[in-house]
Amino acid sequence: MWDLAQQYPDTTPESSPLHETRARERRSSLVDHRPLKRASSLSFRIHTPCDYSSGASMTSCTSSTSLSSLGSLSSSARQLIMSRKTSPRHPTRLKTRFFSPFHSTNTSPVSPRLLETVEKLSIDNDAHPIFEIPEIVNLILHYVGHDDRERVPTEHAPVRKPPMSLNHAKLIHGEQGEKVWQRTLSTSSTAPPTGNLHNCLLVNKLWHSLTLEVLQENLYFDSDFKLMNYSPPRIAAPKSFVLHKLKSTQQRDLANLHINPVNLEWLEFYICPKLLPSLHLYTAKLKKLVLPGSKVVDDVYLQQIAPLMPNLVHLDLRACEHITDAGLYAIGTHCPKIETLNCGRHTKGILVTDASISHIVANCNLKTLGVAGCGVSDAILWSLAYQKGHQLERLSLNSCWRLTDAGISSVLMMDRFPRLAVLEIRRLTRLQQLRPIVEFKKRQMRRKIAVLVEACEELEARLRAEERSLDLEISTRIFEDISEWLNGDDLQDQIEERNLQQFVQRRSVLV
């Protein structure tokens, strides 16, 4: 309580009736004019925690929450509540009070649907005091928000890429090929999941403020309309910032977001051809950078940002056709922790060659490499085999026109990729020897590694024929071994008889 004597000094004796009357009037004015916190129509509602009372609008506050339910808490939690929430006048009661059902002074009719919604949102006054501790509520909200992070629009890697034609689908899936092909042609999609965290905004003021903080940890926009209508806080410090397929948004529209990169670990502009992340977003904490389909990212930009993100682990630069060996060489120099690199493209593949990829292979901790459509040669495969072969897990070589049997077939024959699980070799027209690829698949299956080899329709047909030929050879050898084992006794008797005759002949010569 405020010290009224200090705020309003008075020379009137305290024992006089005039003094008591003036003090009562001043105390009433303080209560009537005390500033209220700004609240929305639903945040100022039933059972919202309050730290003050204000005249007639809050005269329906119930008595302070009892501490009788603290017995089930640990001593540390009980001490935390008591030190923060106890009232100086009543040590056995909590300071925080709850509103009884709110009745508006407005005489205008209220929608029955709104009344029903408010009734559903009602919370019992006897709620456990543990839900008033911000630290515990924050842990609960992070647990609830775990599913909410799945709503971030990302491109999920398919189990295998869709077939290129009906015949290709039948080669891969057999009798189910026609159904798979029809599913590939369809455009059906599932409805996006609803966010659980948004329901937590409607609990009370404490939950509302903490939920806003959790929601600000992951900023993502999958439409231009949502981005234009976003009202950011004064400064947002998210862990992830994702823009997904924004075609109309301009670069100047991003200046109003006020992103603080102090916590930023994931930065993604997926198919946003006109947008370029600001340089201040790149810090040593950034681990994932995804910029596919950009028409503004070039070598100069990569050379500027590469020294700023030494801890980068995931880099996706697919279809960035203005990037050449110069930009990728800077990435290989300043980002040694990269495990996943995808710089595949459909056009201008000659701009990315062995000069930059070999430098990245030598300096980075690669586990996944995608160079589809690039002008790499067989030398890159040998470099991968001897430097990163023991840890490589995924390799995409689609449409690499310079690759031959001297690279893929020879390296696989030597078993230099013991952990490789995904190999993409679509549209490699210069491949002739496919037996090493089939043997590689069987070798990985014996290691209990589920291997996936993605090939085009022509290569898939040849691989299936090679698999049948190899299976026939294996079955023939098995049959020969069984026959030899069954006839092994007769053969052993013949050998022993021949050895005996030779021994007798030698003895006769000696005699």
Swiss-Prot record:
Domain of life: Eukaryota
SMART domains recorded: LRR_CC (SM00367)
GO biological process, alphabetically ordered: cell division; SCF-dependent proteasomal ubiquitin-dependent protein catabolic process
Primary location group: cytoplasm
A cellular component term, taken from the record's GO annotations: nucleus
Start-end of Basic and acidic residues biased regions: 17-34
Keyword Transcription: no
Stretches the record annotates as Disordered: 1-34
SUPFAM superfamilies assigned: RNI-like
Subcellular location per the Swiss-Prot or TrEMBL entry: Cytoplasm; Nucleus
This protein's UniProt keywords: Cell cycle, Cell division, Cytoplasm, Mitosis, Nucleus
CDD domains, alphabetized: AMN1 (cd09293)
Protein task: Negative regulator of the mitotic exit network (MEN), required for multiple cell cycle checkpoints. Required for daughter cell separation and chromosome stability. Involved in copper sensitivity.
Family the UniProt entry places it in: Belongs to the AMN1 family.
Identification of the protein by name: Antagonist of mitotic exit network protein 1
Organism encoding this protein: Ogataea parapolymorpha (strain ATCC 26012 / BCRC 20466 / JCM 22074 / NRRL Y-7560 / DL-1)
Lineage of the organism: Eukaryota, Fungi, Dikarya, Ascomycota, Saccharomycotina
